Design a protein with these regions (language model features):
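A short, basic/flexible loop-to-alpha-helix module at the beginning of a structural domain
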Residues: 1-6
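N-terminal Rossmann-like FAD-binding beta1-loop-alpha1 element of flavoenzymes
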Residues: 7-35
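Conserved N-terminal/central alpha/beta ligand/cofactor-binding core
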Residues: 32, 38-177
Length: 179
């Protein structure tokens, strides 16, 4: 069955990246947002069951140190503007996960920005990356799935804000209105 769905912005995927995009768009306001997921439930890297997240504090020293570590890690070949945004937005994670989504973090490892990059750690998107911030170990449920629980709660929050979710719905074609 073919169906046309109209939206201002379409997000493909309901994993960490897709949900992050939907969250930022919903909070910008004034947009009709549709999130499409080809699987019957939320997917993406969340199926790898992350039990922690990294957050670079929003201080000049921490932001600069994390940026420099990730720039060197990529041999300065990555999209440096994107790295800057990722590091900056990661400072919002504790507020979102702990306060808004009510995910518990029984242990937080606060890191000195001068030590960023000196040991392996769970960093943004890299399970064996270089640590570039504070590490929050989060409670899961059942066999784990701490981030899956966070993203499920985020989905419920976004649905209340009017974001539409379509599961088992791979996108077949995008029709752009050039208004």
């Amino acid at each position: 069955m073919n169906k046309t769905i109209e939206a201002d912005v379409v997000v493909m995927g309901s994993g960490v990246a897709g949900m992050g995009a939907a969250y930022k768009l919903a909070n910008a306001g004034g947009l009709k947002i549709a999130v499409f997921e080809k699987y019957p439930a939320q997917g993406g890297a969340v199926s790898n069951c992350p039990m922690c997240f990294c957050s670079t504090p929003d201080t000049p020293e921490a932001q600069k140190s994390a940026y420099e570590v990730l720039a060197r890690f990529s041999n300065y070949s990555a999209n440096m503007e994107l790295i800057s945004k990722v590091v900056k937005y990661s400072s919002e994670f504790p507020e979102l996960f702990l306060n808004q989504l009510k995910i518990e973090a029984p242990m937080v490892v606060e890191r000195d920005p001068a030590d960023y990059g000196n040991q392996r750690g769970y960093t943004m998107g890299h399970a064996n990356g270089l640590d570039v911030g504070d590490i929050y170990f989060i409670n899961g449920r059942g066999q784990g799935h701490g981030m899956a629980l966070a993203l499920l709660r985020l989905r419920f929050m976004l649905e209340k804000q009017g974001v539409d979710f379509y599961f088992s719905t791979p996108i077949k074609k995008i029709i752009r209105d050039e208004k």
